[in-house]
A protein has these predicted regions:
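Residue-level signature of transmembrane alpha-helical cores of multipass secondary-active transporters
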Residues: 21, 25, 66-70, 74, ...
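Membrane-proximal transmembrane or re-entrant/amphipathic helices at the cytosolic face
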Residues: 322-356
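Specific pore-lining/lateral-gate transmembrane helices of multi-pass inner-membrane transport
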Residues: 140-254
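Hydrophobic alpha-helical transmembrane segments
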Residues: 22-85, 255-261, 274-294, 337-344
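Interfacial/gating helices of multi-pass transporter permease domains
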Residues: 59-63, 99-103, 107, 125-149, ...
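Membrane-interface junctions at transmembrane-helix termini in multi-pass inner-membrane proteins
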Residues: 2-26, 85-88, 225-256, 298
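Helix-loop interface residues and adjacent transmembrane-helix termini in multi-pass membrane transporters
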Residues: 14-15, 59-60, 132, 169, ...
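Interhelical loop/hinge segments that connect adjacent transmembrane helices in multipass membrane
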Residues: 47-65, 69, 78-118, 161, ...
């Protein structure tokens, strides 16, 4: 079902109907969440009261309820999309199909490599730690990794919005300058998120990590955030191979990133424990970002203002690491740094807007 609605969702993004896109996505999540609450909380309540619904007789394992909720939400989304299918119509074009396959197959390979980057840190932690500790350490690591959700949400929203924008401007003679400006905006805001989360992490931990036993693992958070920032920059820098139909480069870069993930985890976890896994993720995404930049500037030069971008990234990273690892995490000092960064970001964004 999710595959069948991929093209309609892409059409909404391409046509700039971001509100409609968001409405459907939020509706899907709301239905899914509501059904999970119904199945996993209300149904057991009814069962304890002696009520048995027909659906309860068909489900033997509670995990089946999760699958069922997802299936119903996806089915409703597909039904909602049906009028769009009728409006667009169907036309089989073998030449277009070949072009789509040539473009999309490397993206599929890149997606597999991305899954390696995202999941193998836990695999290696479990493999390299003693069996008696592995489950507890993976739980601690995964619990603290959730603090990267702020950067992840920003990157996801950015990627969903920026890719249709990149393609719609590909034919414009000023496209490289536009891409450079968008990347500068991303760098400024992503740097702000990095600093903000690092400064207020002792407040966020109460919300996202209720298990106090996991708090000792918060030391991984700056590297998780920096890794996600590098991933976001990679998505922005990867415009060159997407708009020029050279997606095989995306597969190559992602596979290299997967290789870095494997080697770095095997090397660093025995030295630094689960902290090594977070550093490995940062090295993998950082390597992919730099590789995409290096190759891209030779294949499709874009005039990125690296002096300004680098200044904000260095400022944000330096302040975040110093506050988190060197200082005593004084909230007043951290808040002053956040306000100072916000002021500089405001001035820079205002200046970039006024540039022609």
């Amino acid at each position: 079902m999710d595959t069948l609605v991929a093209i309609p969702f892409a059409w909404y993004r391409y046509s700039g109907q971001s509100l409609h896109y968001a409405f459907i996505k939020i509706g899907n999540v709301t239905v899914n969440l509501g059904l999970n609450l119904l199945f996993l909380l209300y149904f057991p309540f009814l069962e304890n009261k002696g009520y048995r619904l027909p659906l309860m007789e068909l489900v033997s394992d509670k995990t089946q309820y999760i699958f069922l909720a997802n299936l119903i939400a996806s089915l409703l989304t597909f039904i909602y999309m049906l009028p769009l299918y009728k409006r667009i119509g169907f036309l089989w074009d073998i030449a277009l199909w070949k072009r789509l396959f040539q473009y999309a197959f490397p993206v599929l390979i890149a997606g597999i490599a991305f899954s390696i980057n995202e999941a193998f840190d836990r695999v290696f932690i479990r493999m390299l730690y003693p069996a008696s500790l592995a489950d507890a350490v993976v739980g601690l690591y995964a619990g603290c990794y959730k603090m990267g959700v702020f950067m992840t949400l920003f990157i996801t929203a950015y990627k969903l919005g920026v890719e249709p924008f990149f393609f719609s401007n590909a034919a414009d003679k000023n496209a490289p300058q536009t891409y450079a400006k968008v990347t500068e905006y991303f760098s400024i805001f992503a740097g702000g998120i990095l600093l903000f989360v690092c400064v207020y992490i002792d407040l966020f931990k109460w919300l996202l990590i209720p298990n106090r036993a996991y708090w000792e693992g918060l030391k991984i958070v700056p590297f998780v955030l920096m890794a996600n920032l590098c991933l976001g920059l990679y998505h922005s820098l990867s415009v060159w191979y997407k708009v020029t139909d050279r997606t095989h480069w995306g597969a190559i870069i992602s596979l290299i990133g997967g290789g870095i993930t494997i080697v770095a985890n095997l090397s660093l976890i025995p030295l630094w424990g689960y902290m090594g896994a977070a550093v490995a993720t940062f090295l993998a995404y950082g390597g992919m970002m730099l590789l995409s930049l290096w190759i891209g500037q030779r294949k499709y030069p874009i005039p990125y203002p690296w002096q300004r971008i680098g200044s904000f990234l260095l400022l944000s990273t330096g302040l975040s690491l110093a506050y988190f690892y060197i200082g005593d995490r004084n909230l007043f000092v951290g808040s002053t740094a956040v306000v100072g960064y916000a002021f500089l970001a405001y001035k820079s964004v205002k200046r970039v807007k006024n540039e022609k």
